[in-house]
Amino acid sequence: MGGRRLGVALVATWALASRGATAQVVRYEVSVLSPGAHLFHVKAEFPTDGKDTLYLALPAWSPGNYEIQNYARYVRHFSATGVSGQPLFWDRADKETWRVATGKQRAITVAFDYLADTIDLSIARLQADFGQFLGTNLFMYQPGRLDRPSEVRFALPAGWQVTTALKGSGSGPYTAADYHELADAETFVGRYSVDSLKVDGKWLRIAVWPADAYTPAVARNMRSSLEKIAQTENRLMGGPPYDAYTVFFNVIHDPISFGGGLEHSAAQYDIMPASAFVDLAGNLGDFMVPLMSHEYFHLWNVKRIRPSGMWPYDYHAEQYTPLLWWSEGVTDYYADLTNLRSGLWSVDQFLHNTATDMDQVEAAPEPWSEEDGSVATWINEVFVNSSQLYYPKGAVTGMLLDIALRDASNNTRGLDDVIRALYTRYYQQGRGFTTENLLALLREFGMPDLDGFYQRYINGREPFPYEAAFAKAGIAVNRQITSVPFLGVHAPLSDQGRWVAQVVEPGSAAEAAGLAPGDVLLKIGDIAVRNDEDWSVTFRRRYQGQAGAPLALTVERDGRTITLNTKVQERSGTTFGLSRNATPTAKQAKIWQGLAAGTTGG
């Protein structure tokens, strides 16, 4: 600890007022009057530009979380007034848009309460000593005027502080150049720990709630890991793309076991169960390092290197793209490379994680295209969890592309060149990229049989040629087709971060136990069902070879915790192990070294 503390503002009060020279600025005030009611109070002043009617909306979703959330559902006590405080007529234009009759006022002020009672990566939360929100939650916008700059001030209980990705200091105002920057701003208010360190000349802040979760041992390990992650990824991409970066951590306790992260242009917001955050000695949990590496690499891949289907963002509706396998899955691959290249992971850890990705790909209930999965992620399919599939399959695809590029070029080219070219030729030119653009770059950098690879494995459903592909980097594949434990339940993650049974397979162990749709999975045998790890993979490994053994399912049904009894069943499945060849050829060794160290050449 002991680093410089940045961006901390104490209680601020603010009267919304129009200031002629900056009339185009939208001004917001966020206040907390009664934390126990879980209500933020929001005021926003919009210039009318002489319009008789102003349309104001809240987003339907948050970029990075590809799910319609409809944030307008949390609004109550909406009102609209003119510059002198006189009430103005308003009504609802659609589910998320308010229509206000301006009465020829030069500016109007809208106000509302916002319910914040959910632990989620893209939903607001407020309690006795702490609050958290994303810009998409609280800040209305004027459709068609996302270019407007904005200012935000806070009115908070005594002793509360503010840490936000927005630019500002002291009591504010905090500023955003346009609505996209405002919508992307993660914010903590309340009492929590704030630390900071400088990496590559830029400040990196760490905000952790609750404060007592950030012990000296945790601080030491967190700072060391983040420094290595940032240095490694900054070096790959040519330096940090931000003025300052913030890592927001929300450490939660049982019975909620939700974990994950959400990327932002100058921040990441991570939720982690206390049991997975650190151990008793303050060492970071197994999921922590890959999570931080993944979210940090999103600074480039998706926040800046973005599919054209999401350029610019449309907050009103779904934005479909077939490229989430690249934006999320290849980001997973680069997170793994970061951990290897920085020394945070050993070679064995890297190969084990890759093998686990392969296990997940092969365990899919049916052959599927990662492009189709990218598009379908918005609907939370009943039988296939698309988002849980294009992450591992995209990661494996990234590694196969990397090895193929290095093999074809004698290690003078690799996927690093492709990701950097996407950054300079598309993001830095102010545009998104398409599948055709990506394929053109892969072709330019020497990807052999690109059209065939794309049609078979990315847009197609053929199994990956693991053995032939990995052999080029001197990696041996141990493929075992065995009987693996099979529970027989499809349980997607709910908005509350719980795994809820949706479909129970006929004749399965789950059906024999009496598991029913709507049951919340808590434990499968002795395995806690948590989102910070793939519990289904853990289940298969833990109960391998135990067909017929007793198996207890702990679930929550109708508010009660009950135990259901069944027996382990198995079905045919594939598991993988990866290891380095003890006697690689010179070329194999060169390719592996280039991949592992991020180098090209002889």
Model-predicted regions and their roles:
Residues 195-324:
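Juxtacatalytic substrate-recognition/specificity segment
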Residues 112-193:
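Extended, low-hydrophobicity, Ser/Thr/Pro/Gly-biased non-transmembrane segments
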Residues 40-72, 140-157:
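Surface-exposed beta-strand/loop patches in extracellular or lumenal glycoproteins
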Residues 71-77, 115, 147-163, 167, ...:
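Zn2+-dependent metallopeptidase catalytic core
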Residues 32-33, 64-127:
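A surface-exposed beta-strand-loop module
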Residues 335-336, 344-602:
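C-terminal recognition in membrane/secretory proteostasis and scaffolding
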Residues 42-48, 58, 98-128, 150-158, ...:
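Short, hydrophobic/aromatic-enriched beta-strand segments in well-ordered soluble domains
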Residues 268-270, 275, 304-305, 316-367:
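Post-HExxH zinc-binding segment in Zn-dependent metallohydrolases
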